[in-house]
Design a protein with these regions (language model features):
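Short pre-active-site segment immediately N-terminal to redox-active cysteine/selenocysteine motifs
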Residues: 79-82, 86
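The canonical Cys-X-X-Cys-His
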Residues: 87-91
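N-terminal [4Fe-4S]-dependent radical SAM core
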Residues: 1-79, 93-97
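Non-catalytic surface loops within mature trypsin-like serine protease
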Residues: 39-41, 82, 157, 180
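A short alpha->loop->secondary-structure connector
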Residues: 95-105, 146
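Membrane-targeting and insertion segments and their boundary/processing signals
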Residues: 49, 57, 61-64, 85, ...
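Conserved AdoMet/S-adenosylmethionine-binding subsite of the radical SAM
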Residues: 108-246
Length: 249
């Protein structure tokens, strides 16, 4: 179903600015954002994939990967179509880059009941970037908490203060998955993102403004995204901003 988004601003001349991710797409009437699932219809921003689940699987939590939050638990993983990144090597390309709105119609209550029926301990919003369908994820997440399930995002971290604030309403854990250690040239050439800085800003926003458990991964792409220099910079950032230096000898 189509539902009006929450994370957006109205501009002049019936234009809108999406604030779900750091692209901040400004859209005229009938224009669709880069993600392919949020668009301007009659001067309001609609989410075209609300309740459209393109994939649903039960996974071990470690597959997300999440390794320090309820290890050994089972997760019901869901996704919609679309993504705000254009990774040329994407493993889930058929989902993330699909430009046709498809999927099984499911209400938040049905998503959660499916998770319960499969014996899952929580729900992961994954396979594509969940921040672009965050309004649907939030509604699922609220119901999930009522059923004593936890919620996980597997995210590229290219988010905004507004999306982080909404995450804080329902999210228990987030894995922010860096690509190529956020080397700027790699990010621009292979992902279509002009600047990786919003990822770092998102992590600090989550740390400072929420109680969400954070895990960080880094996808190394051999030959094109394997800079040792930027891997060291990323490690230094994690150590300086998230490390418990008192425990380091």
């Amino acid at each position: 179903m189509v539902k009006e988004a929450i994370l957006y601003e109205k501009l002049s001349n019936n234009k809108v600015r999406c604030t779900a991710c750091a692209r901040y797409c400004e859209l005229k009437e009938e224009q669709i954002g880069l993600c392919g699932i949020r668009g301007n219809q009659n001067g309001k921003l609609d989410l075209f994939v609300y309740g459209k689940v393109i994939a649903g699987h039960v996974d071990p939590i470690e597959k997300k990967p999440v390794t320090h939050y309820y290890p050994g638990s089972k997760i019901y993983s869901i996704a919609t179509t679309g993504c705000n990144w254009l990774c040329k090597y994407c493993q889930n390309y058929d989902i993330s880059q699909r430009r046709k709105i498809e999927g099984t119609d499911m209400t938040p209550e049905e998503v959660v009941q499916t998770a319960v029926d499969t014996g899952a301990d929580g729900i992961a919003y994954t396979y594509n970037e969940p921040s672009i369908f965050i309004e649907f994820a939030r509604d699922c997440g609220v119901v999930a908490h009522q059923k004593n399930l936890f919620n996980i995002f597997v995210s590229n971290g290219y988010d905004t203060p507004g999306s982080v604030k909404m995450m804080g309403e329902f999210l228990d854990t987030i894995t922010v998955d860096f690509k190529g250690s956020a080397e700027p040239e790699f990010i621009r050439k292979f992902i279509g993102v002009p600047d990786p800085q919003p990822i770092f800003d998102t992590l600090l926003e989550i740390r400072d403004k929420t109680k969400i458990h954070v895990e960080i991964t880094d996808l190394i792409v051999p030959q094109v995204g394997d800079s040792l220099e930027y891997a060291e910079k990323l490690c230094r950032f994690v150590y300086d901003e998230f490390g418990d230096r008192k425990s380091v000898v």
